[in-house]
Amino acid sequence: MKFIIKLFPEITIKSQSVRLRFIKILTGNIRNVLKHYDETLAVVRHWDNIEVRAKDENQRLTIRDALTRIPGIHHILEVEDVPFTDMHDIFEKALVQYRDQLEGKTFCVRVKRSGKHDFSSIDVERYVGGGLNQHIESARVKLTNPDVTVHLEVEDDRLLLIKGRYEGIGGFPIGTQEDVLSLISGGFDSGVSSYMLMRRGCRVHYCFFNLGGAAHEIGVRQVAHYLWNRFGSSHRVRFVAINFEPVVGEILEKIDDGQMGVILKRMMVRAASKVAERYGVQALVTGEALGQVSSQTLTNLRLIDNVSDTLILRPLISYDKEHIINLARQIGTEDFARTMPEYCGVISKSPTVKAVKSKIEAEEEKFDFSILDKVVEEANNVDIREIAQQTEQEVVEVETVNDCGPNDVILDIRSVDEQEDKPLKVEGIDVVSLPFYKLSTKFGDLDQNRTWLLWCERGVMSRLQALYLREQGFNNVKVYRP
């Protein structure tokens, strides 16, 4: 099988040297992602496209799906690459490929040609289109808005029969821009802003301020691992967790109620800037949107920015919440965000929307900054690839099984869309569907006399959720890995 990777248009307008660098980086990213599925595949770069060739037909859908999630790719074409002799040979091959698709439909033929031939692209379009119209009685030519467009590409003595076109996410290849550190909370905003910077070519590291204990960190790890695994797995990134409960405690004890929200955000920026400096990261990324909450007015954002020289990027600054939620739904983080608790908003009852710098600084003089230095120094830094491995260690008390007993029920915890696309069926065994984001509220409603075997496709989510349920006191859970 063969895929043709078409570049994001902004790459094609770069200077020759920059364009070549971007294409080289994108080629490497594609190799890094796809080697997990097929180590024998070939990735070949050209001036205006990249070819991916693989032998294992069983991996076709997996490879195609992975390609559509790599930043820098505008769209991919799944093609059948065959030799041809003349225009009539092109027509005959097109007839075999497209006959079933054109039955009872309107169609047109569109051809791209490169190389030396005694015919033009329009000649091929007319010849093939006329032939298909004659040989498929129920089909009809329609040049504007047809039901089916027959795409053909002629390259020297090769004919590319395009079997399907699939849109990519666009943007720049990861690694073409410098690294950033995303302040991730697991909510709608931080997940989307992280995705937007990945799509723009940045390697995104994650910094999490833990305000809610182990369960909160597990949830945010899930989001960060999901984003990395889905859109950024071509590169290694860090996940830095900072226990911010001592900082919140100091703020609650010593800071005036109205100033708490702004001062908490200033402390977060201070801490994140120290982490960014430690690892040579150029900018911070936040999910703040103008006017969304009290700390996100222009006055307050300016005061928050003042505590650090590090550049702070806010890709969602002009977005409304509905737009952000729609983007979260598109990239797959909506379900995580809906069940993620929001801790920042509960610490201040009457937050100021227009903080005064002198008042903020006066309040901060009461704060013991050694606490902030200590939590940053003790921050837990892990390679995001180790999150799954650490989960295995953390869930060591949760048994992993590969078969089922008479009292066992398999619990499919994938999202609803995944369950509908690939329903899980195990002969002779009950399978119950309960998406992972409903486990915290709905698992207790299940029959607790049964043993529940949590299952997801790759096993990461099931282990994380098993740990969470064990922490909640449910001992009748295991991880199912057939």
Curated annotation (Swiss-Prot):
Keywords: ATP-binding, Cytoplasm, Disulfide bond, Nucleotide-binding, Redox-active center, RNA-binding, Thiamine biosynthesis, Transferase, tRNA-binding
Catalytic residue positions: 456
Enzyme kind, highest EC tier: transferase
InterPro entries (UniProt xref): Rhodanese-like_dom, Rhodanese-like_dom_sf, Rossmann-like_a/b/a_fold, ThiI_AANH, ThiI_fer, ThiI_N, THII_Thiazole_biosynth_dom, THUMP_dom
Subcellular location: Cytoplasm
Disulfide bonding pattern of the chain: 344-456
Pfam families per record: ThiI, ThiI_fer, THUMP
Function per UniProt: Catalyzes the ATP-dependent transfer of a sulfur to tRNA to produce 4-thiouridine in position 8 of tRNAs, which functions as a near-UV photosensor. Also catalyzes the transfer of sulfur to the sulfur carrier protein ThiS, forming ThiS-thiocarboxylate. This is a step in the synthesis of thiazole, in the thiamine biosynthesis pathway. The sulfur is donated as persulfide by IscS.
Protein family membership: Belongs to the ThiI family.
This protein's name: tRNA sulfurtransferase
Source organism of this protein record: Shigella dysenteriae serotype 1 (strain Sd197)
The encoding gene: thiI
